[in-house]
Amino acid sequence: MSRTDYAFESLPISDRAKRAKAAGADLLVSIHGNSAENPNANGARVYYNADTSFSKTAESKLLATAMAEEIDRLCPSSTATSTVDGSNLAMLNGTGNIPSVLVETCFLTNEADARNALSEEWQDRMAEAIADTISATAKGICTKD
């Protein structure tokens, strides 16, 4: 856990994976709110590192898929189904042998998603979906090389 309170810490994205590695993390889950120029963009997105040279691509994809399914189950949205995307995002690069995903919980630039994000019930369900997925899948994918 890199934050334990609401204090904002400006840590460059390139350093976040390094911090996880230095801490001996078994898993990296980075949680964000998304935005887009198109106000119709909506729903959750779960990204994993699809670079074939990354040693934990399969484990990361498994975690991302399970996470998207659990988000859809616990946070049904009238806006969109969660999607999983293999990507080359800076946040997911440099994680070495740590399975890692980036969760964009919603699009804050979409009116319906933003309304959901303000709901304490929705926040609790999203947190539960993420925590349940970590708990259910971590044992099977968190093995050090």
Where do the PLM segments sit?
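Catalytic-core regions of hydrolytic enzymes
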Residues: 1-63
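Stable alpha-helical elements in mature extracytoplasmic
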Residues: 12-16, 59-63, 67, 122, ...
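Solvent-exposed polar/charged
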Residues: 21-22, 73, 94
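Glycine-rich loops and low-complexity Gly/Arg-rich segments
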Residues: 26-28, 53-56, 70-73, 126-130
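Active-site-adjacent mobile loop/cap segments within catalytic or ligand-binding domains
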Residues: 30-38, 47, 80-145
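Active-site-adjacent substrate-binding region
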Residues: 58-85
